[in-house]
Amino acid sequence: MTTKYVATLLILLGLFVITAKFARATEEMRSNPPRSLYAVNESSDHRGSISVYDMDAGHRPVKTLQTVRDVSDVRGVAVSGATGKLYVAYRNVSGTGMVYCLDVYNDSVVWNRAIDPGVDRLVINPDGKLLYVPTWEGGSADFINVVDANTGDTVRKVHFSNRSHDAQYPLSGPIFQETKAEDGSGNYLYLIDPTSYAISRIGPYLGILGPYAVDSTSSYVVNNVRGLWGMQVASLKTGEIITATVPDHPPGDAGLLHGIGWTPDQSEVWQNSSGTDPRVYVWDMRNPMAPVLKETLILRSGRGSHWLTFDIKGDYGYVAPVKNSADGTEIFNARTHTSVGVIGSSEDMLEIDFADGKISQVGDQYGIGRR
């Protein structure tokens, strides 16, 4: 075998290896785009599955992950960048509260467990080891469950108020929790220390709380409040609570406006109107304790909404329709406030970013502050 022949073989082998690596990298990018939106589907035909969208390609659908059967009501989603595991809380067709764990790297369901006595909008510790799972707004239990994220086993109960609903773990912590308790304790927002499990609270507010969002330094929290056309803002440092009302709103009782969040730069708070009104209110938050209503957006559907959140960079705002609706989730340019598209119905969604085949950062189901 001549030297020239050997050299040619080595060159061809090198080209083959490079081509194979490029093809593998291209396939990984197609499967996991650098900025991916993972959205748990709510429509009746696909409820509980997860659609993945390429955010940098006009939210092009990339894949749909078939997960578990018999999902009746999706209650929340959380993900750990540290472990690559994603968690979905849901109620099945029998009314049992469940959580399933998905491995983001291979799209497989790792476990699917019933959590007694129920589940609601869960969150995960930044280290990926523990889930904090409310016991359902329609229940009567006076605690939330702390769950081993690796196995689904409940390892602790934290008692404080009944009908626990939305848990949140903002960038600066601690664990936040609201409840739908009718005994007066639902008029407070609870803070739970993730190390000692000591509990403190902010309030009372004007009524029972709904969705809320905390800024990046855990200095301010914005809240939906039952019966209020507007929002309340609390200083977590002083305990002061102010009320910002919508001057021109539909007639009648507000009920509970459902959906609120900071833009990542914290310059604005977006707030959904009622479940039948297609408006989204945009508040100027340059002075968090003196919000100014600056704009009102109108949804394409002409109907109401139930949730909203943002991507990590602040490019997009996502406004979800009422629960289990066939209406799509509308995408807005978060800077210009223009509508730029619609994806399938989902209010349980978050961003996952990839670099070199690994998760580089993760977003949140809430519109938390990121400044």
Label every model-predicted segment:
Residues 1-9:
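Bacterial N-terminal signal peptides that target proteins for export
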Residues 9-17:
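Bacterial N-terminal signal peptides
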Residues 16, 24-371:
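Predominantly soluble domains enriched in secretory-pathway, periplasmic, or organellar proteins
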